[in-house]
Amino acid sequence: MKVLYLTVFLLAIVFSISAQDQTYPIFDECLNVQNSENQKNCFESTLLIKLKERLQLSADFNKTSEEVNLIFEVDENGVFNLIFVEANHPEIKDKFKSAFDNLPQVQPSQAYTNATFSQFSMTLKYPLKDISSYDIQSRKDKPQEQQLQLSEKLIEAKAEFKKIEADAKPYDGEMYSSYVSIPLSHEIYNRFDREINLIGTTAHTAQKPFTYQDVKPYYDFKKENKKLAFNKKSWFSRKLLDEHLATVSGKNYWFAVDFGVDLQLGRDTGNDLDTYNNTRIGYIQGGIGKKLTYYGAIFESQGRFADYFNRLARSRNPADGYPAVVPGRGVAKSFGDNGFDYPVTEGYINYRFNDNFNLQVGNYRNFIGDGYRSLFLSDNTSPVPYVKVDAKFWKVKYTNIYMQARNTNFLTEGGAYSTKFIALHHLSWNVNRRLNIGLFEAAIWNNEAERGFDISYLNPLLFYQMVEFSTGTDAGKVMVGLNYKYKWTDNIYSYGQLLIDELSVDDVFGGDKSFKNKFGLQLGLKYFDAFKVKDLDFQLEYNQVRPYTYSHFQQVTNYAHVGQSLAHLWGTNFREAIAIARYRKDRWYGHAKFIYGLRGFEPNADNIPFYGSNLFGTERNIFSETGVEIGQGNKANSTFAELEVGYLVNPAANLKLYMNLIHRDFSVDVQNERNFDNTTTWINFGFRADLFNWYFEY
């Protein structure tokens, strides 16, 4: 590399500073120069001298005539940054970059006595000649106005990242005033159940999940969580006990990221079986503007449970060879010694058009009802793909949910699970300060022969059984229902549901107990602050569903998803009585639960004859058209008792530490491979992100 004897011959130099009322940057050589014009000249000439000293090009460029366009800045610390260089030869570009990198630090520009960055453009031509003989002037072929405009645009571009940083602000619990859904957890909903059901409140409580904004007028999560805060100083303590793992918040956006777990260790003493669950969870919740919110979670799990629960999972094995469906979670493959590996993903995007209309699209859960169970739509299944539209006006809230459910018992020709579609409608009406009445309808049709989503079912009006007949008698099935809630006092309300599956008036009132008399009934009562003990709550509930309800003569057109009932987790053909007590104090909580059930099961695995208990049987094989009673088939009695005590470790992430004790006694008239006498005592210790209800009361 030969040192190029640089002589300066500058045909054009244009400097344009980025803002008015600014001084020029000052080299050490210019410290004693007075007035702005002289400082400008000193800065320009000194810069050119220092560039000349640092530009070392190979001998090949001695005779090169090369125009070079430069844009650079001096930041608020006085450091030169070359933003743009245009030249034909790559070596010239590289040398200019190196030269600017090696320029000394200067005093930055001053704007109103504050250091600020300034930006310049410059055009040079090689070979360069003696700088002292050069008279600085603007290029004639490139007007100064154009260069100034270019510089200002680049200044704006360079400021984009700083603008994002300037818009950022500390996270301040934006989630608690957003339209993010509150996780469907009985422990979480119990915190505000009394407040949202006071006489005179207008919340439509049968349609769940609620959003934080829905609940805020009655229960302020942000305020209540601050009461529980430990206010630790260390990062680890704050993230473990009080805060989300990571949060980002700005002028029109926010999101919170958490890493959760569901770790359980236990023992089924009645069957001499160690149990465990190992779930790792990554989940994000956020909002863009005031109207768009979202949630997404990934669960990666392995587990082994009490013997009765493992057997139930295996009895629901899909048709494609997987060994099990874990109730409440989904299809599982084998893991380790009689364990399961069952990944789950869930999430949604929610858009709030205005105070009257809301749209949500997701793969998640919904619940309709005021009870512990629902005979309309429950949250005991795996997440279901859906589109949900809510309309709220006057004293009414109207919900339309369009779902795509999977039949894991049946495969298409391509080997995929067959699908069916469900159009569900629920109208909630606050009749007065105390009484709420709801109307329900669900239409189900299968996707055989690639029928797809029948747009006839997009009709948002209730009670359109006529659609079924207009598309053919084999089109699908329709269920209708009625629910109510009555607030007796601020501390007591009763509730109920009546479900009618494929209403046939003659058979319902015929008196011969026809198999077409398919209905379900729920009655319940909640008592808050029982016996004047704050946060002590009681609940009593009775449920019954007659045989053949939720099933259909086409097996794929039942009311189920991934082998699980979309309504009551027992499916059909049962009576059930439930008593629940709950108590909470600060971060501590506890509940006790007792459930008694009279149930009927299919004597044979192939559901022939069909007694109406298995949703996947067909009405073509019914045991009898008349004389149908609850408990028919293989009659069973079951009791289920549960005690759980826990501590809310982190309210923001819903992370809890708990101990759970279950005693289950199940006796059946006829022992077989699927149903047999079994007594279980299952003790479990867990550390869990409480993001969904997980039911074990089978």
Per-range role (PLM):
Residues 160-436, 443, 447, 512-516, ...:
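Outer-membrane beta-barrel channel domains
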Residues 5, 19-155:
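Charge-biased low-complexity segments
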Residues 5, 64-66, 116-118, 276, ...:
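Residue-level preference for beta-strand/loop junctions
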Residues 342, 435-443, 448-698:
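Exposed, low-structure sequence patches enriched in small/polar residues
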Residues 72, 84-87, 122, 126-128, ...:
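A mature extracytoplasmic/lumenal domain signature
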Residues 103-105, 259-265, 660-664:
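Generic short beta-strand segments
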Residues 4-15:
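Sec-dependent N-terminal signal peptides
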